[in-house]
Structures are given as structure tokens and as C-alpha cells.
Design a protein with these regions (language model features):
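Mid-bilayer segments of alpha-helical transmembrane spans in multi-pass integral membrane proteins
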Residues: 93-102, 130-138
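Transmembrane alpha-helix interface/packing and boundary motifs in multi-pass membrane proteins
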Residues: 91-98, 246-262, 266
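Membrane-interface alpha-helices at helix entry/exit sites of multi-pass transporters
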Residues: 82-87, 101-106, 113-130, 279-290
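Predominantly cytoplasmic-facing regulatory/coupling regions of multi-pass membrane proteins
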Residues: 1-90, 146-254, 276-312
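Hydrophobic alpha-helical transmembrane segments of ABC transporter permease domains
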Residues: 127-149
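Re-entrant/interfacial helical elements at transmembrane boundaries that shape
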Residues: 102-115, 256-274
Length: 312
């Protein structure tokens, strides 16, 4: 390759990275402005320490899911360090604010790229981890809503439908069939051999990891209420309600394919908060908007920190 061609490729690579950054920044700005507008002009007794706590709990809640993705990469035969996996996982969340969800895959697969990491298998692992999280979230929501909102079966059956949509592709036989249908590993024997995984053990591991994640995300919603000065809806007394509200709204938002589920996630969360906690529409609206802002700002902060972490 001539020096001129090499320089041109490097220039195009830099330009592409800058374009990705600009796209992500633009859609994050749009999401943040919409969420801020939802807060309206109502006055709340904001508690800064609880706002920070809600963000910290959210980031902690993502950790088990990131660890599960690392597990998936390892059993797929990919050699990557845990710090690199978690770095890619957290930064990759910014991609969900770009239409189509594809930017999540682009960011994660690009950041995890290494000589001993197959890009095709890395992409497969991202879909597998994400669908596992969505399936577990819908499963938990369905179980809780079947008891807590027995009179409103729409939410229960909606959770069941979402669980089937996200859970069916991760069943081992279905997963292998879909991977073959997509042509993954067709031209690489080692890649094809690694796709003999997953088994039902991986589903069990995902159930455990993702359940912990969802519980912590529910705790972040509780901390958001505390940040608003609402202290009469305790976490231990209403833990299942927090869990159902967060999980069902997030799963529905994800499967809507709208950037960050904006609108869909917020509407379902609002409706569930009103029904499960018997609070006003105004309180539920502010909680929903504030939760989105706290989570987005937390993602921006951790991504900015991790971006400058040196990787090998």
C-alpha cells in the first residue's frame, strides 16, 4: 500500500469516528431537551445527594449486564480483558440515542476490536446479551403484574408478548439457526465452531445476572423519587412495583426501535407509576423525565471517563 493510500485510509477513519461522535451528540442533545421540557414549571424539593445516588445506582445496575456480556464473549472463544469489555459496554450505551439501535453495535464492536476478537462473534454476543436482558426484564414484569395488577390484564399480556419476542431468539436451537441463516461463520470454521454455544446454562447465568441488574435499576427509580422529595414510597415495601415499572417500560421502549425508547418508555412508565403507586400524573411525569435525565447524564459522565482509559 502506498503512503498516499495509507494516509487517505487513516483520514477517512478519523472522519468516520468524528461523524459517529457528532451523530451521537446530536441525538443525545435532542433526548435531553425533550426530557427537560417534560419537567415543566413545577416546583419540587430536589435533593442533590439523592440525584447523585440515583445515577450511581444506575451505573452499578449496568455492571452485572456488562459482566454477562464478558461471559458471553469468553464462551464464544473471544480473548478480551474485562476492563476492555466493560469500557465498550458502558460507552456503547450512548448509541441507543441514535435511530435504529445499530450505533450501539457499532460502538461496542468497534471498542472491543482486537486481534483475538472476531467482529462477527462480537456482534452476535451484543445481540445475545441485549435480548437476554430484555427477556428477563419482561419475565420479571409479567410475574409481578400478574399479582399486583390482576384487574388490568393488558400490562400482563403485554409483558408476556415482549418476553416471547425477546426470549425466543436466545433459545439455543433458535439462536444457532438464526446465526446460520445470517451466514455467520460460513467462511470461517473456527467462528462456526464457536457458535455451537450457547446452551441452557448460559440462559441460567443470564437470568441471574440480569435479575440483579433489573433490581438495581428499580432501586435507581426509587432514589429518583427520593431526589424529588417523595419519601412515602419505600423501596422494601414497594420493591416489586419499582421493578415491574422499570423493566416493562424499558423493554417496551427497546423493542419500539425508537431512539432510547423515547415516548414509549416514558408513557408506559408513567401509566404504571400512577397505577402501582396511586400517585398523580404530574408526579409520575416528573419522575419519568427526571429518571431519563439522571440516566443519560450518568452515561455521559462514565463514558467520558472510560473513553480516556488506556486499553491494550
Amino acid at each position: 500500500m502506498s503512503p498516499h493510500s495509507s494516509f487517505l485510509i487513516k483520514l477517512l477513519t478519523v472522519a468516520l469516528k468524528l461523524l459517529i461522535v457528532v451523530l451521537v451528540a446530536w441525538f443525545i442533545r435532542d433526548t435531553l431537551l425533550k426530557a427537560w421540557q417534560q419537567l415543566g414549571r413545577q416546583t419540587w424539593n430536589w435533593q442533590p445527594l439523592w440525584i447523585i445516588s440515583a445515577g450511581a445506582i444506575y451505573l452499578l445496575g449496568l455492571l452485572p449486564a456488562g459482566l454477562y456480556w464478558h461471559y458471553v464473549l469468553k464462551v464464544l472463544g473471544q480473548q478480551t480483558q474485562l476492563k476492555n469489555t466493560l469500557r465498550a459496554y458502558y460507552i456503547g450505551h450512548l448509541g441507543k440515542y441514535v435511530p435504529g439501535k445499530a450505533m450501539v453495535v457499532v460502538l461496542r464492536a468497534g471498542l472491543i476490536r482486537a486481534p483475538r476478537v472476531d467482529t462477527a462473534l462480537a456482534t452476535v454476543s451484543i445481540f445475545y446479551e441485549t435480548l437476554t436482558m430484555m427477556a428477563v426484564g419482561a419475565f420479571l414484569a409479567a410475574g409481578i403484574l400478574a399479582v399486583r395488577l390482576r384487574e388490568e390484564r393488558m400490562f400482563f399480556w403485554g409483558a408476556i408478548a415482549l418476553m416471547i419476542i425477546s426470549g425466543f431468539p436466545i433459545l439455543p436451537p433458535v439462536f444457532r439457526f438464526l446465526a446460520q441463516l445470517a451466514g455467520i461463520g460460513k467462511s470461517n470454521e473456527s467462528t462456526c465452531a464457536n457458535l455451537s454455544w450457547p446452551g441452557y446454562t448460559s440462559i441460567l447465568a443470564g437470568l441471574v445476572c440480569m435479575s440483579v441488574s433489573w433490581i438495581l435499576l428499580a432501586a435507581s427509580l426509587w432514589a429518583t423519587f427520593r431526589a424529588m422529595g417523595v419519601d412515602n414510597i419505600g423501596l422494601f415495601e414497594h420493591g416489586p412495583e419499582y421493578l415491574a415499572a422499570v423493566s416493562l417500560s424499558m423493554v417496551a421502549g427497546f423493542l419500539s426501535f425508537i431512539p432510547a425508547g423515547f415516548g414509549v418508555r416514558d408513557l408506559i412508565l408513567l401509566e404504571l407509576l400512577v397505577r402501582l403507586f396511586a400517585i398523580s400524573d404530574a408526579t409520575a411525569t416528573v419522575a419519568s423525565a427526571m429518571l431519563r435525565i439522571i440516566w443519560l447524564v450518568s452515561e455521559l459522565i462514565i463514558s467520558a471517563i472510560l473513553y480516556f482509559v488506556k486499553t491494550k
